[in-house]
Amino acid sequence: MIVVDSSVWIANLRGGQSEAVVKLRAIEDPTTILVGDIVLLEVLQGARSDAHAARIERAMREFTIESMLDEGIAVRAAAHYRFLRERGATVRKTIDLVILTFCLERRHVLLHDDRDFDAMAAHLPLRVM
């Protein structure tokens, strides 16, 4: 499965043409796209209105949506934070740690447009698209 980060969804909604957005639009099989619940949260909280949020939600529900955080992921995400900190990689958002750990645990590929994930992938076996 391909986990698509909010950075890509938001850029796509804004009509962006970044490399990640182009890759998202090129995915031929939408059943391979996974939307994490916390990614859905990040995207919806940026909507301009309730009506805009409803349109975005309808569109995103076309893909598989999964919960990304449970007790095990929380513990391993904290361990990843310490591991990365020891190597000088600063993680600015806890949500990114959850997404990272979810992808590592489930062996999913991450499609992102966020430099923080590049720093994490330099130290952990995160598969990125």
PLM segments and residue spans:
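Acidic, PIN/NYN-like endoribonuclease modules and their adjacent C-terminal/linker elements
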Residues: 1, 104-129
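Histidine- and aromatic-rich ligand-binding microenvironments
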Residues: 5, 36, 92-93, 114
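A general structural signal for well-ordered alpha-helical segments in protein cores
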Residues: 21, 40, 53, 74-78, ...
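A generic structural signal for short hydrophobic patches within well-formed alpha-helices
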Residues: 9-10, 40-43, 117
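Active-site neighborhoods of divalent-metal-dependent phosphate/nucleic-acid chemistry enzymes
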Residues: 66-111
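Conserved beta-strand scaffold positions in the cores of enzyme catalytic domains, especially
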Residues: 65-66, 128
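Structured helix-beta-strand junction loops
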Residues: 29-31, 62-63, 87, 106, ...
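Short, well-structured N-terminal submotif of metal-dependent ribonuclease cores
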Residues: 1-35, 45-58
